[in-house]
Amino acid sequence: MIIAAALCPAAPLLVRELTGVHPVVPDLRAACLAAVAELGAAAPDAIAVVGVADYAATWNAGWALDAAVFAPGAQRHPSPWPPDGKKPAPDLPPALGIGGWLLDQAGRDADRILRSVASDEPADSCANIGAALASARERVALLVMADGSARRTRKAPGYLDDRSVAFDASVQDAIRSGHLDALLSLDASLAHELMATGRPAWQVLAGALRGRKVTSDVRYSDDPFGVAYMVASIRVR
């Protein structure tokens, strides 16, 4: 059963070992760490980290983010990374590695489930993955790593697409209102065109909490560098 959930972006700029001591977007990192800390405070039996990758799979919970995935020699700030007992794994999807990094920074040592969802996963399959995660343990906290559109400005990775604002607003409205089922109706083709890579992960979230009453606190919402990032804490009533 899902007892709490958090939504964070799968953004490499969160990771201190990649950016240095001073956060590139300090408010974003602080919001993510606060959301992850709240997950741990719910005393889960396990924390399931969900992120988008090339294919759906369950990954070794002892694997950690490999900074060299982003650039050889990318670790710019000396630190004891990865933590004891974890192995840097270049095959681990970055979204899951970044999620694990956030958990480690927040000192959350509950058992972990690392679950990727394919970038082209249909909505019903995403929902089924979410339902399976919800039944994995008696008390499961869910950390969803997902980005909105990367076409928010002319300097965005995908340049400006005027449709991106309305699309991202529909996602945020579903999160804020607690009407997560609306995420299952997102247009996958439009999400792809807008480079909103988080679409499948949002739909896993909806499947995991289908039929549950939730309240949400959006801790951060902005589009630095033209990419929509949202951080939210979702509390199950």
Predicted regions and their residues:
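Short, hydrophobic/amphipathic alpha-helical packing segments
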Residues: 28-37, 123-130, 202
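Conserved active-site and cofactor/substrate-binding residues in soluble primary-metabolism enzymes
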Residues: 23-30, 93, 97, 166, ...
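Polyanion-binding loop/helix "lid" in catalytic or ligand-binding cores
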Residues: 175-221
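A short aromatic-anchored loop/beta-hairpin motif
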Residues: 1-90
